[in-house]
């Protein structure tokens, strides 16, 4: 009988541990200096966007001030933000990538 109680407890605990992770939007913010071609390159390189998808997102960034590159679990989103910001600085562009909870 004690085993049944333990099994129920383990099953209940396993269910609570399987909650989906919080998701975060990775966002590129518009600026007046970063070339559109560089933004397209970033979208293709870091977010696996094809030419048309990258162009559409770049135009949204240009016209709306920001654009969503993708939605990811926090750890992945945080890594992509850091990679994009580092790549932009290495290429001497002020492009800013950020994240916000989805």
Swiss-Prot record:
One of its GO terms (biological process) is protein catabolic process. It comes from the Bacteria. SUPFAM superfamilies: ClpS-like (SSF54736). Belongs to the ClpS family. Binds to the N-terminal domain of the chaperone ClpA. Involved in the modulation of the specificity of the ClpAP-mediated ATP-dependent protein degradation. This is ATP-dependent Clp protease adapter protein ClpS. It comes from Shewanella loihica (strain ATCC BAA-1088 / PV-4).
């Amino acid at each position: 009988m004690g085993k049944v109680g333990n099994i129920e407890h383990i099953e209940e605990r396993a269910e609570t541990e399987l909650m989906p992770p919080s998701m975060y939007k990775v966002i590129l913010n518009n600026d007046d200096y970063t070339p559109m071609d560089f933004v397209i390159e970033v979208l293709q390189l870091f977010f696996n966007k094809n030419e048309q998808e990258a162009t559409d997102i770049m135009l949204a960034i240009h016209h709306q001030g920001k654009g969503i590159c993708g939605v990811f679990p926090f750890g992945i989103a945080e890594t992509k933000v850091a990679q994009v910001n580092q790549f932009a600085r290495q290429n001497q562009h002020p492009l800013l990538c950020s994240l916000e909870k989805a």
